[in-house]
Each structure stands twice: as C-alpha cells, then as structure tokens.
UniProtKB/Swiss-Prot annotation:
Binding-site residues, carbamoyl phosphate: R59, T60, R109, H137, Q140, G266, P267
GO function terms (MF aspect): amino acid binding; aspartate carbamoyltransferase activity
The name this protein goes by in its record: Aspartate carbamoyltransferase catalytic subunit
GO BP, sorted A to Z: 'de novo' pyrimidine nucleobase biosynthetic process; 'de novo' UMP biosynthetic process; amino acid metabolic process
EC annotation from Swiss-Prot or TrEMBL: 2.1.3.2
InterPro entries reported in the protein's UniProt record: Asp/Orn_carbamoyltranf_P-bd, Asp/Orn_carbamoylTrfase, Asp/Orn_carbamoylTrfase_sf, Asp_carbamoyltransf, Asp_carbamoyltransf_Asp/Orn-bd
Signal peptide: none
Organism per entry: Helicobacter pylori (strain ATCC 700392 / 26695)
Top-level lineage group: Bacteria
UniProt pathway: Pyrimidine metabolism; UMP biosynthesis via de novo pathway; (S)-dihydroorotate from bicarbonate: step 2/3
Function (record text): Catalyzes the condensation of carbamoyl phosphate and aspartate to form carbamoyl aspartate and inorganic phosphate, the committed step in the de novo pyrimidine nucleotide biosynthesis pathway.
Keyword Hydrolase belongs to the record: no
Family per similarity comment: Belongs to the aspartate/ornithine carbamoyltransferase superfamily. ATCase family.
C-alpha cells in the first residue's frame, strides 16, 4: 500500500485555514525572496524535485524551478519532447519510472484533466498539479488569490468583491480553478465571452465586454486557447480583440469602479486580450502575478515537503 502523503491536485485539497497559512507564508516571500529560514534551507537541501511537463510552459515551469532553488532544493526538469514518451511510452509508465528514482516531489502538467488524479493513486511522494487539461491549475489560482489578498489587504475585504472573467472561459483551467476557489471566499462572479467559449454553469454570464467592465472590481482576462478549438470561432484574433479586448477607452467609458484591477495568467496576447497601454497602467497586476507565482510556489513546496 502506498504511504499517505499530501498532494495538491485542485484547490479543494486545501482547507480554508491551510489557504490562509499559504497566503501568510507566500506574503513573506513576496516581500523578500531571501526570507527563507536557515532551518527550512537545511531541511530542503537534500530534496530533489522533478518537473514532468507534457505541455509547454514558460511562467509555471520557470516559477517552480526558481521557487525550488530559492528554498534550497534541487530540481530536475525533463524535456518530454526528447524523452521516452516520444517513443510511445505511456504516461503511467513514464511516471512510474521517474517515481522509482524516489524524488521527494513531482510537479506535472498534462493535457488530460484526469492525469494527475490517476498518477496520485500510486504516488508515494507529493504530487503537484501544474495544469491538467481544462480542469485545474491550483497554484495559479493560489497566486492569483495572493495578488488579490495583497491589493485588498485581507480575505475579509475580498468578500463581496465582483470579478469578471473575460475570454475563453470554457477552455481555461485557470478560470475553472479560480472560480471554485473564489466562490469559497465569497466573491461574486461574472463570465464574459461568446457563447462557444462559455461553460454551462449557474453563474452570471454576458457576451458584452462593456457590461463585464461595468460589473467588476477585478477583471481577469484570459487567452483565447485556439489549440483547444476544433473549429475557428472568429475569423482572426484581431476580430476577437475588437469585441473583447480590455482597452483604456472601454475602461474609461464603462468602469463604475475606476480603481478596477486587471489580471491575466499569461501568455498575454497584447492588443487582443488587453491593450498594451492598459498593461502598462498601474491597475494592471500582471507582473505582480508572475512575481507572486514564485512566492506562492515556495510556500506550497515548503508546505507539502516539510509541514
């Protein structure tokens, strides 16, 4: 029988008290990446973490690598394009072979939503889901929450705030994880997209970006995930941007909360998802999200490997 260990496959794996602890620890690291205690560094020194990414990544894989190194751990990144997976080895066999080398944690990303849950059934080390299909990306939701926590000052202040997700919500694991987490914390949610990009959920929806902007205290723009579309929804990304881009003009004309903040999980399609001028605006928290990704992943790794 595999021994019991903690995994992070979805945000519901964490209690609210554990989420608060992660926010507190990550806030310390966000203020100073070098604020890792000597005791933590000593305990992490001999830890070996494997990053097993079957899909492309820039921010997430780099963020986990930097987080691991800042804690004092070692990380091994596997290039799946040159691995035995490209020769026909199954996901399960690849994982079991890596698992047999006894790493202290495995971080995985896969196109199938069920992949991390299947692997967790026999994993004897902590498994972190760094993105699975369109269903879950828990550390992204946590770092987004950290960004909101910093801006609004507390979880209590977040209750009742209104957030609009604009873009390809249906195919976004980021949106899915964020929605589930933010509902637990009492935020009001609206989804804004063309019908083909909206999931079947009992939430407020609109096809009108101006309505979403007027509704929100927080705007979360999402990339159009054309790689997950069977047929084109718009003739071009420019046509999509004409309808859904967050622009200064739209913010000025329609935002009831003039201090509305703008988030995006990346990669951003400039002038398609968000206008370049808005990305440079102080209301944009996109680069803060990237920084907070390192801090939150430091907190998550420490929580799973040491606590």
């Amino acid at each position: 029988m595999p021994k019991k260990c903690r995994h992070l496959l979805q945000t519901s794996d964490l209690s609210l008290d554990e989420i608060k602890l992660l926010l507190e620890k990550a806030s310390v690291y966000a203020n100073d990446f070098n604020a890792v205690s000597l005791e933590t560094k000593e305990k992490m020194h001999n830890k070996i973490i494997v990053a097993l990414f079957f899909e492309n990544s820039t921010r997430t894989v780099s963020s986990f690598e930097i987080a691991s190194l800042r804690l004092g751990a070692k990380i091994v990144k596997l290039n799946m394009q040159t691995s035995s997976a490209s020769k026909g080895e199954t996901l399960t066999d690849t994982f079991k072979n890596i698992h047999a080398m006894q790493p202290d944690a495995i971080i995985t990303r896969h196109a199938f939503s069920s992949a991390p849950f299947k692997l967790a059934e026999f994993s004897q080390c902590p498994l972190i889901n760094a993105g699975s299909g369109v269903s879950a990306h828990p550390t992204q939701a946590l770092l987004d929450l950290l960004t909101l926590y910093q801006h609004f000052g507390s979880l209590e202040n977040l209750k009742g705030k209104k957030i609009a997700f604009i873009g390809d919500v249906k195919n976004s694991r980021v949106a899915n994880s964020n929605i589930k987490l933010l509902q637990r914390l009492g935020l009001e949610i609206m989804l804004c997209a063309p019908s083909s990009m909206l999931p079947s959920v009992s939430l407020k929806t609109t096809h009108n970006v101006e309505e979403a902007i007027a509704f929100a205290d927080i705007l979360m723009s999402l990339r159009t995930q054309t790689e997950r579309h069977n047929t084109p929804i718009f003739a071009s990304l420019k046509d999509y941007g004409n309808a859904y881009c967050i622009t200064q003009q739209r913010l000025k004309a329609h935002a009831k909360n003039k201090e509305v903040i703008i988030l995006h999980p990346g990669p951003v399609h400039r002038d398609i998802d968000i206008e370049s001028a808005v990305l440079e605006d102080e209301r944009s928290k996109v680069l803060e999200q990237v920084k907070n990704g390192v801090a939150m992943r430091m907190a998550v790794l420490e929580f799973l490997l040491l606590d």
